Amino acid sequence: MALKKYKPITNGRRNMTSLDFAEITKSTPEKSLLQPLPKKAGRNNQGKLTVRHHGGGHKRQYRVIDFKRNKDGITAKVDSIQYDPNRSANIALLVYADGEKRYIIAPKGLQVGQVVESGADADIKVGNALPLQNIPVGTVIHNIELKPGKGGQLARSAGASSQVLGKEGKYVLIRLRSGEVRMILSTCRATIGQVGNLQHELVNVGKAGRSRWKGIRPTVRGSVMNPNDHPHGGGEGRAPIGRPSPMSPWGKPTLGKKTRRGKKSSDKLIVRGRKKK
């Protein structure tokens, strides 16, 4: 998809860009694959705020996505490419030979009418899902499982991809987009290709209201708060934070402080850590 630019007829339109949705072939979703998605506004079951900057936004329905790709031996035809308000990637509606319909994340280059399949014997082509042990070294993949049968968890957002680097015993070496090299069980599945909608990261929102339509509320700087609201708050005028390092609203060091818990069982599976920005 290409970027669409607007004439600067208002301050909100100036520099605003959006996607032209040229890849989208159908606007109405498949009813059998929809579920209600009630608003949470960042609150938990006690009504307490657990996620900041969430609230409002347009009503949405959840599209049930097949992350497991476990329907082996039955070919499926790509019926349409659709927009999904719940993720950055587009989704593709598959119609299997037995009549079942499922949504998958639409990889780059997937076309309407194309035939895809899952299983160890599937061909190495875009949209097919296979166990990692059956995918050649050097192949670009997405929607990668961390546990066999759990469903894809890695490389699912727009433009995301990983690469198979090698195979060692029951593990396969994968290079993630962050630069991290990780060992994953060879029986875990992944889908061939890169996630589509690559232009998503280039979109300029243009105005605050467009973020509100998405359910994103403003992010207020701690330095403009009061001392009882944030460790950076208080002082006369534009005062410095007065601490050795920046702090989170709850007084924990942030902006560079590592937050990964030590001695995780998966530490032994990380061959090389992610690249530093």
Swiss-Prot record:
Keywords: Ribonucleoprotein, Ribosomal protein, RNA-binding, rRNA-binding. GO terms for molecular function: rRNA binding; structural constituent of ribosome; transferase activity. Pfam families: Ribosomal_L2, Ribosomal_L2_C. Residues 34-55, 213-277 are annotated as: Disordered. GO terms for cellular component: large ribosomal subunit. SUPFAM superfamilies: Nucleic acid-binding proteins, Translation proteins SH3-like domain. The keyword Transcription does not apply. The keyword Kinase does not apply. It comes from the Bacteria. GO terms for biological process: cytoplasmic translation. Disulfide bonds: none annotated. PANTHER family: LARGE RIBOSOMAL SUBUNIT PROTEIN UL2M (PTHR13691:SF5), RIBOSOMAL PROTEIN L2 (PTHR13691). One of the primary rRNA binding proteins. Required for association of the 30S and 50S subunits to form the 70S ribosome, for tRNA binding and peptide bond formation. It has been suggested to have peptidyltransferase activity; this is somewhat controversial. Makes several contacts with the 16S rRNA in the 70S ribosome. Part of the 50S ribosomal subunit. Forms a bridge to the 30S subunit in the 70S ribosome. Belongs to the universal ribosomal protein uL2 family. This is Large ribosomal subunit protein uL2. It comes from Staphylococcus haemolyticus (strain JCSC1435).
